[in-house]
Design a protein with these regions (language model features):
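Hydrophobic membrane-insertion alpha-helices, especially the h-region
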Residues: 13-23
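Feature detects long, helix-prone N-terminal segments enriched in hydrophobes
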Residues: 27-190
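N-terminal Sec-pathway targeting helices
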Residues: 3-15
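N-terminal hydrophobic targeting signals that begin at the initiator methionine
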Residues: 1-3, 41
C-alpha cells in the first residue's frame, strides 16, 4: 500500500513538474533560438549502449577501472584557468590530472548502498569520468556537447555474480550534433 502511494506521489510530481515547466516556458521569451529556430525543440537520436560482462569479481574490475583514471580536482582546474593567461600551460596543468586512460574521475555514486534502502544487497557503482581538455575540444564547437561530458559508466554485479560494465558509446552521444569536429575525437574512446 505504501509503495502504491509512493508511485502515485511520484507520478503526480512528474505531472506537476511538466505543467510548471510548460507554464514557465509559455511566459519566458528567449533571446536566442534553439536549433531549428524554435524556442523549444525536441529531437531523437540513437545511442549505442555497451554492455560488457566478465567472471572477474566486482572488486577486481572496479580496482582495475579506477587504476586507469586520474583524479579530477576542481581547485587545480580553477587555478590553471585563472593563472598566467597562457592557455597551453593551463591545458597542460588540467591534462596532468588524467590517468593512463587519458580520463579522470569526477565522482562516484554507490547505487549498491542506495539499494539497501529497498532491502536489496547489490554491488553497483556509477562513475563520472572525463577530461576537461577533451570537453573543451568539443564544446568550443557546440556547447550542447557539455550535456554528455563528463561521461557515466556503471559497474555492477548481476544476479549470476558476473561483473557488468555499461556505458553509452561516446561517439554516438556526441555524433547527434552533426559536427565532425566533435564526434571525430570520440571514436577512439571505448
Amino acid at each position: 500500500m505504501a509503495t502504491q502511494r509512493g508511485w502515485k506521489l511520484l507520478a503526480f510530481a512528474i505531472m506537476l513538474a511538466g505543467i510548471v515547466l510548460s507554464s514557465v516556458l509559455a511566459y519566458v521569451r528567449f533571446g536566442a533560438q534553439c536549433p531549428g529556430g524554435n524556442p523549444m525543440n525536441d529531437s531523437r537520436f540513437l545511442v549505442d549502449h555497451v554492455h560488457l560482462a566478465t567472471d572477474k569479481t566486482f572488486e577486481e574490475v572496479t580496482k582495475a577501472f579506477e587504476h586507469q583514471l586520474g583524479q579530477f580536482d576542481a581547485d587545480v582546474r580553477q587555478r590553471a584557468i585563472a593563472g598566467s593567461g597562457d592557455t597551453e600551460e593551463a591545458k597542460a596543468k588540467i591534462a596532468a590530472m588524467a590517468g593512463p586512460s587519458g580520463f579522470m574521475l569526477f565522482g562516484t555514486s554507490d547505487h549498491g548502498a542506495l539499494l539497501r534502502l529497498a532491502g536489496q544487497k547489490r554491488k553497483a557503482i556509477q562513475y563520472v569520468v572525463g577530461n576537461p581538455v577533451f570537453a573543451l575540444q568539443m564544446t568550443q564547437h557546440d556547447i550542447r556537447a557539455s550535456l554528455y561530458a563528463p561521461l557515466r559508466v556503471l559497474i555492477y554485479e548481476n544476479e549470476e555474480k558476473m561483473t557488468c560494465v555499461e556505458y553509452d558509446r561516446p561517439s554516438s552521444l556526441f555524433g547527434q550534433f552533426g559536427d565532425s569536429r566533435i564526434a571525430s575525437g570520440t571514436t577512439s574512446w571505448w
